[in-house]
Curated annotation (Swiss-Prot):
This is Acetyl-coenzyme A carboxylase carboxyl transferase subunit beta 1. The gene is accD1. It comes from Roseiflexus castenholzii (strain DSM 13941 / HLO8). Zn(2+) binds at residues 30, 33, 49, 51. The keyword Repressor does not apply. PANTHER family: ACETYL-COENZYME A CARBOXYLASE CARBOXYL TRANSFERASE SUBUNIT BETA, CHLOROPLASTIC. Keywords: ATP-binding, Cytoplasm, Fatty acid biosynthesis, Fatty acid metabolism, Lipid biosynthesis, Lipid metabolism, Metal-binding, Nucleotide-binding, Transferase, Zinc, Zinc-finger.
Length: 298
């Protein structure tokens, strides 16, 4: 088993976003090592620096994991509602929604749909961190619950790719109840024997981590991803202690048994394909076992 994921990685190309603006600068500076990287080379390397630092991908770029032309989007018109007419000293929620929709071209922070990896069908949900921090509100939760139901009905695996600050505070209790709602939907997916594979990318916090991602059958994280419930600064201010430098990193969580693996972005499609192959014929294998003669008891 230890050699299961050591095959030559099959890379994926980040999907091109329509009408994407030409970058103003020809170079990108890595925030980790400070090196200047030629923009085209940086894009070809899936926005990963040679030092290993993984920069953020847009939600639609993550769809490059799927087979070309296989993605079909669901519920794109489903949009958040400002039920509380939320206003704070810093912003008006309705204005913030409009700005995020204009900036990202999305109605909300989650894209859902169906697709395939190496010909194996699945349902997928991808967060967009640039849309109010990838936060989960009412429309987000409804989209996610619907795609989980779709996966259960079609009896295919669910893949979620998650970068989020947690539940959307501007929607109050409506946002919090989505945590229970999507987890309830996941029980139906489990009942039909289909897996939920969660990929955690930097950052993944709050209600998103505390609900559907933590109960996934397989939890994968990118190297160096920050993952936790409360943020590092909040914890340090609360306990009045300095936390270790590697606290809440993907590697820290792996060493404490909280996630299953840490996978570099360039190897992710290959690892997902391997996992999907393991699950692909699971119902048939289960039926074979059920129909096999009972073992003689000692």
């Amino acid at each position: 088993m230890k050699d299961l994921f050591r095959r030559a990685p099959k890379r994926f190309t980040a999907a091109r976003i329509e009408n994407q603006a030409i970058p103003d600068n020809m170079w990108v500076k890595c925030p980790s090592c400070g090196d200047l990287i030629y923009t085209r080379q940086f894009s070809d390397n899936l926005k990963v620096c040679k030092c290993g630092y993984h920069m953020r991908l847009a939600a639609r770029e993550w769809l490059g994991l799927l087979d070309d032309g296989s993605f079909v989007e669901f519920d794109a018109a489903l949009a958040p509602v400002d039920a509380l007419e939320f206003i704070s000293p810093r912003h008006v929620y309705a204005h913030k929604l409009s700005e995020s929709q204009e900036q990202t071209g999305l109605n909300d922070a989650l894209i859902t749909g169906s697709g395939a990896i190496e010909g194996m069908p699945l349902c997928v949900a991808v967060t967009e961190f640039e849309f109010i921090g990838g936060s989960m509100g009412g429309a987000f939760g409804e989209r996610l619950a619907r795609i989980i139901e779709q996966a259960a009905d079609a009896r295919v695996p669910l893949l979620t790719i998650n970068a989020s600050g947690g539940a959307r505070q501007e929607e109050g209790t409506l946002a919090l109840l989505q945590m229970a709602k999507v987890n309830m939907a996941l029980t139906r997916l489990a009942a039909v024997g289909q897996p939920h594979i969660a990929v955690l990318v930097d950052p993944c916090y709050g209600g998103v981590l505390a609900s559907y991602t933590s109960v996934a059958d397989i939890i994968i994280a990118e190297p160096g991803a920050r993952i936790g419930f409360a943020g590092r600064r909040v914890i340090e201010q609360t306990i009045r202690q300095k936390l270790p430098a590697h606290f809440q990193t993907a590697e820290f969580l792996l060493s404490h048994g909280m996630i299953d693996m840490v996978t570099p972005r360039g190897e992710l499609r290959s690892v997902l394909a391997t996992l999907l192959r393991l699950f692909h014929n699971a119902p048939e294998r289960a039926a074979d076992v059920q129909n096999a003669p009972a073992l003689a008891r000692a």
